[in-house]
Amino acid sequence: MKDYDLDLIQVLWVEDDPMVIEQYPLKAENFGLQLVAFPCWDEAKAALENDFDRWSAIILDAKCKYHRDSEDNAVRFLGRALNDIALICEKRGRVIPWYVLTGGDAEEVSDSINDDRMKWDADWTNSTHKEYYSKNVDNEMLYKRIKVHARKSPRLQIQKMYKDVFDAIEECGIDDMGYNALEDLLIPIHFPDAIE
């Protein structure tokens, strides 16, 4: 049984600033997003691997930590986290869009971000000439963009098309394997191009 709000788009969020963790999720809910914060990449990676189908997007604070006790280093953190995300998504056969949200040094952050994100976020870079979102001015725009990108996800579209069925699965207490199996059956029927 899912232990989170199915009406909100689930966003895995790597952020270690307590003030940001307290404030940002409230605003994100207004956009239909639930930000689930993890203080370091180790913990976020475990959540991504253990509940992959839950997540519709990933937000990375560029100045976050790879390990709970490591020092902030955007180059090391982003390089390793983005590599891990690519490997996990490839293994699972589904791309989860990721975004970098930072209040840090633009040059250091930009140099650390690979071009994978251009598959879903190229129009942002083309219009702003940035590969990241600024905590100071872009967070609401990021939430809007995540919502738009997530709505295009075949998995979320199936959940909306068959909302009554998935609600019944929840009410009956059927475990996540049944829920995921039904999604896996319905996606190729409605979105054959989404299958690789």
For each predicted feature, which ranges?
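Conserved acidic segment of CheY-like receiver
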Residues: 2-19, 24-28
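Charged alpha-helical initiation segments
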Residues: 134-137, 148-195
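Conserved phosphotransfer microenvironments
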Residues: 54-98, 103-111
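Short, aromatic/basic amphipathic alpha-helical patches
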Residues: 24-28, 110-118
